[in-house]
Amino acid sequence: MSLNSAEKAEIINEYKRGDKDTGSPEVQVSLITGRIKYLTDHFKENKKDFHSRRGLQELVNKRRKLLKYLKRNDQARYQTLIQNLGLRDSY
C-alpha cells in the first residue's frame, strides 16, 4: 500500500510552489520520502518481502537523483528542503 490521497494532498500543499504545482522537485522528493517512510515501517513487520525492498531501492535512487538535480540548480531550495524533511546533506 502507498500513501492515500489525503496524505498526498497534505504533502503537496505543504511543499508546492504554486497553486497547481505537483511536479516541482520539492513536491516529488517529499512524496517519495513519504513512501520511503511507509515502506521502512512495512519492513519492520515483513522482513522477507524482497520484491517491495527492490521498489524501496528504486525510490531511494530516484530521490537521490532529484536531490542532486536540485542541489546543482538551486542550492537554497535544496537546503530548505532537506532541513524540512530531516534528511542529511550527502548528495
Swiss-Prot record:
<dbReference type="GO" id="GO:0022627">
    <property type="term" value="C:cytosolic small ribosomal subunit"/>
</dbReference>
<dbReference type="GO" id="GO:0006412">
    <property type="term" value="P:translation"/>
</dbReference>
<comment type="function">
    <text>One of the primary rRNA binding proteins, it binds directly to 16S rRNA where it helps nucleate assembly of the platform of the 30S subunit by binding and bridging several RNA helices of the 16S rRNA.</text>
</comment>
<keyword id="KW-0687">Ribonucleoprotein</keyword>
<dbReference type="Pfam" id="PF00312">
    <property type="entry name" value="Ribosomal_S15"/>
</dbReference>
<dbReference type="GO" id="GO:0019843">
    <property type="term" value="F:rRNA binding"/>
</dbReference>
<keyword id="KW-0694">RNA-binding</keyword>
<keyword id="KW-0689">Ribosomal protein</keyword>
<dbReference type="InterPro" id="IPR000589">
    <property type="entry name" value="Ribosomal_uS15"/>
</dbReference>
<dbReference type="InterPro" id="IPR005290">
    <property type="entry name" value="Ribosomal_uS15_bac-type"/>
</dbReference>
<keyword id="KW-0699">rRNA-binding</keyword>
<comment type="function">
    <text>Forms an intersubunit bridge (bridge B4) with the 23S rRNA of the 50S subunit in the ribosome.</text>
</comment>
<dbReference type="InterPro" id="IPR009068">
    <property type="entry name" value="uS15_NS1_RNA-bd_sf"/>
</dbReference>
<dbReference type="GO" id="GO:0003735">
    <property type="term" value="F:structural constituent of ribosome"/>
</dbReference>
<comment type="similarity">
    <text>Belongs to the universal ribosomal protein uS15 family.</text>
</comment>
<protein>
    <recommendedName>
        <fullName>Small ribosomal subunit protein uS15</fullName>
    </recommendedName>
</protein>
<comment type="subunit">
    <text>Part of the 30S ribosomal subunit. Forms a bridge to the 50S subunit in the 70S ribosome, contacting the 23S rRNA.</text>
</comment>
